[in-house]
Regions:
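Divalent-cation
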Residues: 1-415
Length: 415
């Protein structure tokens, strides 16, 4: 008789399923989100446990020397131009997930899973998604070995991090970095436009993580104060935004309320040619910037994504008294942070990024390790304390447009 050497905590899995059901009930009561996220996810606790267990073991596999990353979507079998529907169903198993996942390493490609009349799970096809796709199904995103995001109704609910299971809560992370992004200007409407800065910064962090070489990004406000923290001369200095010459600006969004947000998406703006083109160009820009962080040294850019230099070496500012104390937190439910020291942040890349963020209070530093761990560094204006957000890859909005809707909705409700 075979026994699993590892089982995910059943109470955790049951709690995730209960939260999915609670979200479905909330959507039914809330007409705004019911209209956007109309999909009705029906998966039993046992099916969910089997799905997560199989995805977990597949995430540990190496295929021809490469680590496998893939995503699963639980949805009914259907025929569509963007879906390759298999003639014959294949029982859900880790081996086939590894085979298919090795060819679909993209945040816009999914392996489709359904349940038969007897409740058994099967692989039934492959789905290709556009950047404007609303992720309303149950979606499992494998970020690396043992690192799994659980997303439903367009919102990240929970995650597995190696041998830990957590509920994801990015609110503390967002509250820490958005004041720096929204710092210039006080007009509420303009601040909403600055939300664009926020999610493009997360896309760049995704791109940094994807190249798997490790990298450092320094995001700085206007002016040249940051130069005191950089060793001169800088090997690759200049300035550009890395946008296409024929860049099409995204339409201005006069979003006064959550209802305006609903109307914007319901009227099909996401599918308009100019919107799609502009969004694609911005994502290409983010990928180009993220890729350059693979060059040894740091990339410095403005909050509007104008690149000042890359391959830069960080130094301690002469006027800085230095710091040894930090507060470390993760985007997890109930994590309010803990006291730590510089020495436990990681290697030289993390230490230098932390020092830069401490010396430049209006800046944000981002580090992606070769293993795919992402950390954000920023100095809190209220206390002067250096805040480090570790495991930030859990909050990089891999859910795409759906995540933007959720977070923008919450932002509009606060203003």
């Amino acid at each position: 008789m075979l026994h699993s050497a590892f089982e995910i905590n059943q109470d955790f899995l049951a709690s995730v399923c209960n939260r999915i059901r609670a979200m479905r009930a909330q959507h039914t009561r809330n007409p705004t989100f019911f209209k956007l996220f109309i999909n009705d996810c029906r998966i039993s606790d046992r099916q969910f446990a089997d799905l997560i267990d199989t995805a977990y073991w597949a995430s540990q596999a190496i295929e021809e020397g490469h680590q496998i990353k893939f995503s699963l979507v639980f949805k009914e079998r259907e025929q569509a131009s963007n879906i390759f529907c298999f003639d014959t169903l294949t029982s859900l198993n880790a081996t086939d997930l590894v085979k298919l996942g090795s060819a679909l390493e993209s945040s816009f490609s999914d392996i489709c899973i359904c349940a038969d009349a007897d409740g058994r799970l099967h692989i039934w096809g492959l789905q290709m998604r556009s950047a404007a796709h609303l992720t309303t199904d149950l979606w499992i995103q494998v970020l690396g070995p043992g690192n799994i995001l659980i997303i439903c109704y367009g919102r990240c609910i929970a995650a597995l991090i190696n041998n830990q299971a957590i509920f994801v809560d990015p609110s503390g992370f967002f509250e820490a970095i958005t004041p720096k992004i929204f710092a210039s200007g006080t007009d509420t409407i303009k601040d909403r436009f600055k939300f664009h800065r926020f999610y493009t910064l997360l896309y760049i962090a995704q791109a940094m993580r994807a190249h798997e070489r490790g990298g450092t990004l320094l995001v700085v406000p206007a002016g040249e104060a940051w130069k005191k923290s950089i060793v001169h001369p800088i090997a690759y200095a200049g300035g550009t935004s890395f946008l296409e010459p024929e860049f099409t600006s995204q339409p201005e969004l006069a979003l006064q309320s959550a209802q305006d947000l609903l109307t914007f998406f319901q009227e099909g703006t996401l599918r308009e040619e100019n919107f799609i083109k502009a969004r694609t160009q911005v994502m290409d820009q983010c990928n180009r910037i993220g890729r350059l962080t693979a060059i040894d040294g740091a990339l410095v850019m403005s909050y509007n994504r104008k690149v000042h230099c890359f391959g830069a070496k960080i130094q301690t500012a002469e006027t800085s008294p230095g710091s040894t104390g930090v507060r470390i937190m993760r985007p997890a439910e109930g994590d309010c942070g803990r006291k730590g020291i510089f020495a436990e942040l990681g290697g030289n890349r993390h230490y230098s990024a932390a020092q830069f963020a401490y010396d430049n209070p209006d800046a944000i530093a981002i580090v992606a390790s070769q293993a795919g761990n992402v950390s954000f560094f920023t100095r809190q204006s209220s206390t002067g304390e250096l805040l480090v957000i570790q495991k930030a890859e859990l909050a990089l909005m891999y859910e795409g447009i759906s995540g933007i809707i959720w977070n923008l909705f919450q932002f509009l409700n606060k203003t």
